[in-house]
UniProtKB/Swiss-Prot annotation:
GO terms for molecular function: protein-L-isoaspartate (D-aspartate) O-methyltransferase activity. It is found in: Cytoplasm. InterPro entries: PCMT, SAM-dependent_MTases_sf. Its main location: cytoplasm. One of its GO terms (cellular component) is cytoplasm. This is Protein-L-isoaspartate O-methyltransferase 1. Belongs to the methyltransferase superfamily. L-isoaspartyl/D-aspartyl protein methyltransferase family. The gene is pcm1. It catalyses: [protein]-L-isoaspartate + S-adenosyl-L-methionine = [protein]-L-isoaspartate alpha-methyl ester + S-adenosyl-L-homocysteine. It is an enzyme of class 2 (transferase).
Length: 211
């Protein structure tokens, strides 16, 4: 299904529209991306359910609504270069790569990164740079970034990510431990504004690398 929407994917996109996702580019990207490719075969039948699913190593592929919502927020300033923290399965990266000119993505778990790279190559997505490393540190020599998305919950907003955000740039990040808030942070020169978008539930953003 490379670029061709299946009935299940179209139904998912339709349900996301009804749930409040209005960006047509985001909806099309989700409809055109085979979510089952990013899951273990045993979970393939759940690919188009609006739910988070396990991908191994204690990580998950996010609920499609959250993928779409975070992508909408990130696109508000029409970013050219985007940083994703937490490649995971590669599903969110696939959506972003269809919508922005340049995507840089960081993953701390080597086995997940290897699998994600293979999947994204099979989808013929070539505007992605990959880094194996600590997401808390971002990717300084690729910055500054017009937008940054974090796909795991940080206890606090990592200072390195604020530093790597361009002026007028947007950072979309879940913050908190037990109770987590999805924040949209905007840089204004040397200051930052933030707003709470909604309550969310993510795996934690962990320091360091894991082979």
């Amino acid at each position: 299904m490379n670029g061709v929407a299946t009935k299940s994917a179209l139904n998912l996109a339709r349900s996301l529209y009804e749930a409040g996702i209005k960006n047509e580019g985001v909806l099309k990207a989700l409809a055109d991306t085979p979510r089952e490719m990013f899951l273990d075969a045993a979970l393939g039948h759940k690919a188009y359910e609006n739910t988070a699913l396990p991908i191994g190593q204690g990580q998950t592929i996010s609920q499609p609504y959250i993928v779409a919502r975070m992508t909408e927020l990130l696109l508000e300033n029409a970013p050219k270069r985007v940083l994703e923290i937490g490649t995971g399965s590669g599903y969110q990266a696939a959506i972003l790569a269809k919508l922005v000119p340049e995507l840089c993505t960081v993953e701390r778990i080597k086995s997940l990164q290897i699998q994600a790279r293979l999947r994204l190559k099979r989808l013929d997505l070539h505007n992605i740079s990959f880094k194996y490393g600590d997401g808390w540190k971002g990717w300084a020599n690729k910055g500054p970034f017009d937008s940054i998305m974090v796909t795991a919950a940080a206890s606090t907003i990592p200072e390195a990510l604020l530093t790597q955000l361009a002026d007028k740039g947007v950072l979309v990040i879940p913050v908190g431990d037990e109770s987590q808030q999805l924040l949209k942070v905007v840089r204004h020169g040397d200051t930052f504004s933030s707003e709470v978008v909604e309550m969310v539930r993510f795996v934690p953003l962990v320091n360091g690398e894991l082979a």
